[in-house]
Amino acid sequence: MPIDLIAAGQVLHRVHRTPLDPIFFGPGPGIAATNRFDSASGRFGILYVGMSRRGAIAETILRNPQRLMVSMTEITTRAISELSCIRPLRIVRMHGTGLQALGTDNAVSTGPYEPCGLWADALWDHADQPDGLAYQSRHDSSEICLALFERSDMAFDRKGMLPLSGILKEIAAILEVYGKSLSPVGPV
């Protein structure tokens, strides 16, 4: 199995609702799978992070490619946190060369969600006990994101949290790369 090691202390990026804790393995007990790699069986939660700030922002805020403007509400209600695991993470590479080694293709990053939850369950149960998987961002194929499995020995340090509204210049620059801009009012 193609497993990459992410060193303890490596900064990972998470965009989340401002009042909520950035460390959340969802979707939560009794809630049906809603995101790409959520466990199909519901036996464990998933924490979604980006390897870069830009990747985390793309996966969270740029979910509608047809919209040329991002609502300020999307910005004012969210923050970005830097997290780092206190131990190394063993991550299954579900992108690039890892796809062929696993016998799949990039539909795991762009296709229907249902098979992805089954992949998460299978990898969770695998004898190698990986901590999660790395996948190509659906909203920016140059970015790699992680779906981390809820494991009892996984703990994170919080390196910092910034409201997205506090880094508007950086957010605007990132959005410009994608040909988008900020809307000064509600949803557009």
Segments predicted by a language model, with ranges:
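Active-site and NAD+-binding cores of ADP-ribose-processing enzymes
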Residues: M1-R36, R67-V188
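Extended catalytic/binding region for NAD+/ADP-ribose chemistry, centered on the ART fold
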Residues: F37-R67
